[in-house]
Amino acid sequence: MDFSIKGCDWSKGEAKGFLTGKSDCIVLGIFEAQTLSGAALDIDTATKGLISRVVKAGDMDGKRGKTLFLHEVSGIGASRVLLVGLGKQDAFNQKAYTDAVTAAWRALLSTKIVQVTFTLAQLPVDERSSDWGVRAAILALRNETYRFTQMKSKPEPASHTLKRVVFSVDPVDEKAAKLAVKQAVALANGMDLTRDLGNLPGNVCTPTYLGNTAKKIAKDWGLKAEVLGLKQIQALNMGSFLSVARASVEPPQFIVLHYQGAAAKAAPVVLVGKGITFDTGGISLKPGEAMDEMKYDMCGAGSVLGTMRAVAEMGLKINVVAIVPTCENMPGGNATKPGDIVTSMKGLTIEVLNTDAEGRLILCDALTYAERFKPAAVIDVATLTGACVIALGTHNSGLFSKDDALAGELLDASREANDPAWRMPLDDEYQDQLKSNFADIANIGGRPAGAVTAACFLSRFTDSYPWAHLDIAGTAWKGGAAKGATGRPVPLLAQFLIDRAGQ
């Protein structure tokens, strides 16, 4: 799909090109109080009051998400006009904008429209500029057009015909909007990769498959990939990671992916992604109901790989290292048992009270490995705890960090990217729940504050650098009729790196 930018100040009569240029459709916003947006006012004048008449007749009440096509419109180059309800003007925020553009795309994709002129990006949204609106609109469109068909013997072809979108933006934002197009497309491509990896079944998306995916990203985008096998992992004394992997016939992999966009001496940001390609719970076996969704337990790994692809396509001037410990968590005759004690790469001994709390066991060795890069910051991403889903539901990812500056950066990025996160507590008092009578630390801390104690466990391995943890158990995938991976938190991570790179 082709996206282009055209500057236009509708209030200064600069709309001639939009009014006379050929297009299948022009998209206009209408607020609930029957208020026309700047673009709608110009189109209304050009069509001799058609828009006003339609609104006054009650055919378009402006309620959020409502759409109405006007056909064979005279006075403008577009053959159709799509009116989109924006809701109340004083409540028009990021969510309202996203709802409006999503409704617009759904209406457009249900037609045979090929080219559309899109004016909604110029709407005032929480003091955001129109380049923000462009990026959010492209991501919403790519979200609507994403389909996972790789495993279908006869995949259905795309039903829409949309091929070209022209965004009208404020002239002062034209340069930034062109950059926003590039970043949005790269980000959408990274999210699609993340979704594809999550949606693949566990018999396809194995640890080896993830390793090969990392190698392909490196080959396609000029990165450096290292994929360590069992013997190399053993040589690194990653006893905690290996305690999870040991019962599976699928060999574990330890993936390290390097992107260098800045000077070699510049400290990198390290992203660590949990890569459990299927999680049965091990000996602490999960219930059978919905266990198929445990193929999504590698979505942390998928989001890190998707972010690396997006960063490379954007060409960000920053150094980034991705680390992905990946294996299956299976029961078996040689599986780790509840009560076993294992030794981590750091040397801390861990009493494994529950083998279904395995994500932290593979991440802790990866966090120790990250020390060698002398990182500027480390962010781990994991579908870590059901407790986080209970606490936050499926809207916000859980953010844990003792570093206020780093947490602030990530929260700012989450708001800018429209990829919400909520900061959770990480007080020292919670650490007491991880005490063990027999080892340095237990891998669980009981039912109370389960998401917090999981983060506390990880914090024991992050003394030498600024660190944050994102628990995406509630946001990485959806169940029900819309079942599938979401691609989150790639937007948050990418925006954080864009901000760090100053781009």
Curated annotation (Swiss-Prot):
Keywords: Aminopeptidase, Cytoplasm, Hydrolase, Manganese, Metal-binding, Protease. It comes from the Bacteria. One of its GO terms (molecular function) is metalloaminopeptidase activity. Transmembrane segments: none annotated. It catalyses: Release of an N-terminal amino acid, Xaa-|-Yaa-, in which Xaa is preferably Leu, but may be other amino acids including Pro although not Arg or Lys, and Yaa may be Pro. Amino acid amides and methyl esters are also readily hydrolyzed, but rates on arylamides are exceedingly low; Release of an N-terminal amino acid, preferentially leucine, but not glutamic or aspartic acids. It is an enzyme of class 3 (hydrolase). Pfam families: Peptidase_M17, Peptidase_M17_N. One of its GO terms (biological process) is proteolysis. This is Probable cytosol aminopeptidase. Mn(2+) 1 binds at D279, D356, E358.
